Amino acid sequence: MRNFLIGLAIVAAIGGYLFSQYWYYVPGIISAIADPVGENQPVTWQKGPAESSGDSRPPNIVLIVADDLGFNDITFYRGGIAGGSVPTPSINSIANEGLHFTNGYTGNGTCAPSRAALLTGRFATRVGFEFTPATPEFAQLVAGEGYIAENAVDYPPSDELGLPGSELTLPEMLDQRGYHSVALGKWHLGGGKGMTPTEQGFDEFLGFLPGGAMFMEEGDSQVVNSKQDFDPIDKFLWANLKYAVRFNDGDRFKPDSHMTDYLSRQAVRVIEDNRNRPFFLYLAYNAPHTPLQAEKDDYDALHHIADHTERTYAAMIRGLDRGIGDVLGALESHGLSDNTVVIFTSDNGGAGYVGLPDLNKPYRGWKITFFEGGIHTPYFIRWPAKIPAGGQYDSAVAHVDIFSTALAAAGVKLPQDRIIDGVNVLEYALQNPQPPLSRPLFWRTGGYKVVLQDGWKLQLQEQNDKTWLFNLNQDPTEQVNLSLGEEHSKKLKTLRATLYELDSQMAEPLWPTLIESPIAVDYTIDKLPDTAYETIIWSN
């Protein structure tokens, strides 16, 4: 008996040690049991009419959203990843053959709230979607001392975190004109009752409900992996994400290739099957978000890049651009290019936790900040039937505008029972001369609040009473904080009043924050200096 008890104690001690080291694997283990991943299965899309009716029809709409794409990841702005040595001709072509908006802004500095703004035309905080859905396990791992344990006590279960069904989404509105709407890829707006894509207006969905998925299985011979051991987010993703998609509300199964290629091929099929009716395709890639996994052929093609992480990341950009080229090619081959609105953007800026310093160059800040690096994004619209090639518009536009712009193109009136924060940007950009767009844009996460109007940007950090005022018209990279002197006190007072007025209109968060952590503005998380550096406090 004594030996048995000693053995039991040893087993318990070993088990306790292992749990203390690897407890963050628990969500993935539970998910694998409750929602197992099957082998690959074919996908049968609904088919539209065999022939076109010949009647005039509203334009198709293709909304392409990259995930954590840095402003400097593409070569359109004469930069690009790896010193511009990885061309992005397909992405660039959307801008070159249409309009590029020099001051495009995301809905938020993180993934999910931006997507809420994209699909509702409302500030994410007006919806109450202030924070990216997170489990307490994730928050505890990534936040460290910034973890708010008391808020985890009554924290809602994961299936209650998402976009409320009472919100009107873009596909729901487009249904008024007979659009067939398909969502591909990353959803991140909830997986509970009333929150899935097919319950939020999409006719069909193929992708993953949470905020990420593996691009391939880690041990696949055709994948190259790059793990960021210094990053707790990366550690959590490798431990818990699955290489899996689901079709509509079915069970999860494995794709048959690298996720980016898989989504691109499925998008081509959707275009083919719906070529004879108006369709809305929401193509939400998860590239180049971590975990960094590149297709081996793309990695091998970039032998000139010495750094393994940068090479893997660049290979993911290469695959993303190739996939977008295939989608554009499908539109062309079916004679749909002229009357298809193609919109390209990213959900937020590049992430400092990747460890690559130039992702958002020339801007300061990262994903998880409201500095320009976190929210200033590529924003392109192509519609050959209506938009002359090579256009440019310089006033600030944002993700909330995509809702209104797409509905105007489709001939659908905006809902009248709620505030819509976005506008039809083509109404401004296609005039000659182009009128400025002067309305304020607003962002908030906890006590970190920002307003932008007419090129003037005010950032307030209430937790530590910080203020930043920038004139982006003269200082687009936010180098000179004008709040520190008296010269711009009038502008500061005006913007502060605008910020507080907008802040008062926003909803209470749908769930509490679990994180309040300092985020470095100018350094990647693996290169934090020993001396003082500028931070913001991010709530989530």
Q: What spans do the regions from the language model cover?
A:
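Long, internal low-complexity/basic segments
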Residues: 4-59, 66, 71, 100, ...
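C-terminal accessory region downstream of the catalytic core in glycan-modifying enzymes
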Residues: 47, 180, 187-188, 250-256, ...
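A short beta-strand-to-alpha-helix junction
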Residues: 57, 81-88, 106-110, 157-168, ...
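Active-site His/acidic residue clusters
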Residues: 71, 220, 265-313, 351-353, ...
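Active-site segment of extracytoplasmic enzymes that catalyze sulfate/phosphate-ester chemistry
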Residues: 71-169, 173, 200-204, 214
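Formylglycine-dependent
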Residues: 133-179, 187-276, 285-294
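Histidine-centered active-site microenvironments of extracellular/periplasmic hydrolases
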Residues: 193-201, 291-296, 305-306, 329-386, ...
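C-terminal cap/loop subdomain of S1 sulfatases and analogous C-terminal strand-loop tails that border
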Residues: 204, 208-216, 350-372, 387-391, ...
